[in-house]
Amino acid sequence: MPRYKAVIAYDGAEFFGFQLQTKNGVESVRTVQGELNKVINKMAKNPSPQIKVVGASRTDTGVHAFGQVVHFDLPFNIDPEGVRKGMNTLLPFDVVVNHVEHVSDDFHARFNTHSKRYIYRVSTTDYKDPFKRKYTGHFHWKLDINRIKAALPDLLGEHDFASFAASGNETATTIRLITRADVDEKPEEHEIVFTFEGNAFLYNQIRIMVGVLLEIGTGKRPVHDIVRLIEVKDREQARYTAPASGLYLDEIDYN
């Protein structure tokens, strides 16, 4: 069976995350993987056993994606562009397939990843903007962006990020490599945008890192408190977790 790799984008606001969730063998809530499975199986004339779409990243409820990657096998060979068009015809409006290509049978969307890039958008308006509430994390306290910029290099490199892992983390190790951590100001949009890139991230790691950086920006934490948090390996000391609404899976690299 030919294997396909697809790059998809989705508005995560109305999804309970990417990963399929079932109860008694039946899909219990709306998920991105669930929608993709339905479409692929419809295109394949509902084969038995059912085709399962495999995703690179299991984004949480409310998290968005510009560059999620999935793979799936079809029981017949179709031109990748035809697959893309067919999927987009059947998918709901909050999911779109931007690219499809043939890949080797041993390609795996999750296990072959080299690095992932995420962005986090923070709305800095004094009031909550109702039109941004599903697409940014709101933080109205005054921020010193220079303090945040001074703290970001402390995240770079390979560290034990146990202090930045939520209680649901199930990975064998909390050691991760971060290769990029920066922030851009968007004054015309009243936003700041964080970008993080690394080999992998722990459960809620980016949202917890953003929470710590925002507290550094307000002066609630010392500029280099990240160094201490890495050393103590204590999630309780990291405190604030930024909302899911501001997080976007931007790109996944397989090189």
UniProtKB/Swiss-Prot annotation:
It comes from the Bacteria. Substrate binds at residue 118. Keywords: Isomerase, tRNA processing. It catalyses: uridine(38/39/40) in tRNA = pseudouridine(38/39/40) in tRNA. It holds the Pfam family PseudoU_synth_1. Homodimer. It comes from Leuconostoc mesenteroides subsp. mesenteroides (strain ATCC 8293 / DSM 20343 / BCRC 11652 / CCM 1803 / JCM 6124 / NCDO 523 / NBRC 100496 / NCIMB 8023 / NCTC 12954 / NRRL B-1118 / 37Y). This is tRNA pseudouridine synthase A. Formation of pseudouridine at positions 38, 39 and 40 in the anticodon stem and loop of transfer RNAs. GO terms for molecular function: RNA binding; tRNA pseudouridine(38-40) synthase activity. InterPro entries: PsdUridine_synth_cat_dom_sf, PsdUridine_synth_TruA, PsdUridine_synth_TruA_a/b_dom, PsdUridine_synth_TruA_C, TruA/RsuA/RluB/E/F_N. The gene is truA. One of its GO terms (biological process) is tRNA pseudouridine synthesis. Belongs to the tRNA pseudouridine synthase TruA family. The lineage of its organism: Bacteria, Bacillati, Bacillota, Bacilli, Lactobacillales. It is an enzyme of class 5 (isomerase). Its EC number is 5.4.99.12. The active site is at 60 (nucleophile).
